[in-house]
Amino acid sequence: MKKSLLLLLLIAATIPVSAQSFWQDLYYEPGFDLGHYTPFSANHKYIADYLHYGLDVRIGQEHQGILIGYTHNTLDSVIYYTHEGNRYGPIGDCFSLAYFVDGHIYKGKRWSFDYDIIFGADLWTRHGNEMLGSALNFHVSFDLGPTIRLSEQLDAAIRYGYYHSSNGATFLPNNGINSHFLRMALRYHPNGRTEPLQPENQAFKKKNNLMISEGLGWLQTYTRVGDQLPNETPFFLGNTFRVGFSRQFHRRFRWDVAVDLLWTGETRYCHELEGVPYNFWNSTHLAASADFEAQFGRFAFCAGAAYYLYHGSKLLPEFYTPYYERVGYKFYLGKNRNYYIGTFMKIHLNSIDYIEWTFGVNLF
């Protein structure tokens, strides 16, 4: 456990910094978290009886920073069973290293109502159970709440938020950890407060673009053999190609609507289980989608949803719903920020399909 914490601290220390002003502008925000688990299916209702609590430190500048945290789970002492009777051991504790962006929903003279968007990595001391299929997992959380100015150097912050940790179905079984939490923190500005960044002098101009993106990923199957997951769960390729219309309507916000052409190799596995002939086109899907993004410089946090218009086969993975969600982030490249790379989670009603690794471009 100590070695794992040391590893995360060393990673944080390697974040490249050069300018002296970087250190002068930093604030330090130690906090305490208290939360409860959120069941994701009927046979997991018992986890709502267990709490988790932890400590974290956020080190940041204007609207961004890093988070280093430790979480202890009271569920760690429980031996539990699934509805199939499989015996699983405790989850263990969690070490987190993450990047965050924040902003004001309302800003007054003495207080503000703020949001935080956090993503990074979690290292769990135990894994290979129904909840977590691997030790290293993705960390995603969101929170909202007031920040109260106590003095020129000190703030008090209260946040209520949602937290998720999983590996994106890369290794199964992997239902993931979901929870709601309350966070209380003090923010210290050792060198005083950073002056807010001034908006660009030139007037903002709204932009319309033709948007094209390609996202690849891989997954293990959720499709069961009878009532059980298969003993050997091979990996399958997933792909999402999007083409559509994108509009930058604010300095910080953009939306798009698109047609998604999808392909999943898992369909072949469904055909093999039923003894039905398979061809390449059985794995295709067509959907109409819409995404929204909030931008912080070159970084953008994205969320969206899509509705299926067509399936190449009636034999679909068992967790498929008529719609799916997508959440992730982009990093814009190029002088005019017309290109981007990103990572997205494709989700069917709380079940993560897979992680997409995306490259895209906004044309014209």
Language-model features and meaning:
Residues 30-38, 61, 70-74, 119-127, ...:
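Transmembrane beta-strands of outer-membrane beta-barrel pores
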Residues 63-64, 109-111, 148-156, 192-195, ...:
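Repeated loop/turn-to-beta-strand initiation elements of outer-membrane beta-barrel proteins
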